[in-house]
Regions:
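Structured catalytic core of nucleotide-sugar glycosyltransferases
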Residues: 4-14, 57-61, 87, 113-115
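Active-site environment of divalent metal-dependent phosphoester hydrolases
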Residues: 11, 58-62, 84-85, 122-123, ...
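Active-site neighborhood of phospho(di)ester-bond hydrolases with catalytic His/Asp-centered motifs
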Residues: 26-29, 50-57, 77-80, 138-141, ...
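Metallo-beta-lactamase
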Residues: 80-134
Length: 261
């Protein structure tokens, strides 16, 4: 499998995942042209994308979904409530490209895909566990906390894109209005750097994992701080980096961490 966050951050998200015969995007939250260029930068063609999976209807996850589907005739997969919530924002989609995920499962060519509920302030937000044979990747961002269901999926994954959204002190003393700060810090908001480190401890089960920290706030975080905070949490608990697991940062404005395994 191949796993590559094309863009990851509060300003826009899209992740490329592939097997030998299947190529998909999870979210397309930037302009269509930007995502096209991101794919080209890793040697992929937009017209070869088999599907776009949508986690939820917020703009930083769907901005380019409609234009990419219309331009390249790409099917869009999401659950029913997410479709209802995003339909006006993404524009007219051809009937055969409207794919509703029922019962939290869909097969796309040789990918077995399970969606799992995440805690976020959207209609019916989902993370995805994407499997090919005995390999698995998970996308877990935009979540206020890790439920047991989420942990069960992340426990068995080889590669995980995990949210490390904000530094709590930067958020508390930053420019956001009080109501927005409360939302971000709530159970339907986003994981802080400290929360992310603790979440990794919860899923460190002896199976080596590559964890990519993503969906960083542009205002209330920066990569060096996120990485340092997460590693401090892991080091205090005796986790050995590059033995028990590896940790990398996703980039905001360009493709990063192209992983083939």
């Amino acid at each position: 499998m191949i796993f590559c966050p094309l863009f990851s951050g509060s300003s826009g998200n899209s992740t490329f995942i592939a097997s030998d015969s299947t190529k998909i995007l999870v979210d397309a939250g930037l302009a269509g042209k930007t995502i096209e260029n991101g794919l080209l930068n890793i040697g992929e063609k937009p017209q070869d994308i088999d599907a776009i999976l949508v986690t939820h209807e917020h703009t930083d996850h769907i901005k380019g979904v409609g234009i990419l589907s219309r331009r390249y005739d790409i099917p869009i997969y999401a659950n029913e409530l997410t479709w209802k919530a995003m339909s006006k924002s993404i524009g007219k989609i051809k009937e055969h490209n409207i794919k509703i995920i029922y019962n939290n499962y869909v097969q796309i060519k040789d990918f077995d895909i399970t969606s799992y509920k995440i805690s976020h302030d959207a209609a019916d937000p989902r993370g995805y566990d994407i499997r090919n044979k005995n390999k698995s990747v998970c996308v877990a961002t935009d979540l206020g906390f890790l439920s047991d269901e989420i942990k069960s999926h992340l426990n068995n994954a080889n590669v995980i894109l995990l949210e490390s959204n904000h530094d709590v002190e930067m958020l508390k003393f930053g420019p956001y209005p009080y109501t927005l700060k409360r939302r971000i810090l709530s159970k339907i908001g986003h994981l802080s750097n400290e929360d992310c480190g603790k979440a990794i401890l919860d899923i460190a089960n002896g199976k080596f994992k590559k964890i990519i920290l993503g969906h960083l706030s542009k205002i209330n975080n920066y990569p060096e701080l996120a990485y340092k905070t997460v590693l401090n949490v892991l080091n205090k608990s005796g986790i050995k980096l590059n033995k028990d697991l590896s940790v990398f940062m996703a980039k905001r404005n360009m493709p990063s961490n192209y992983t083939k395994f």
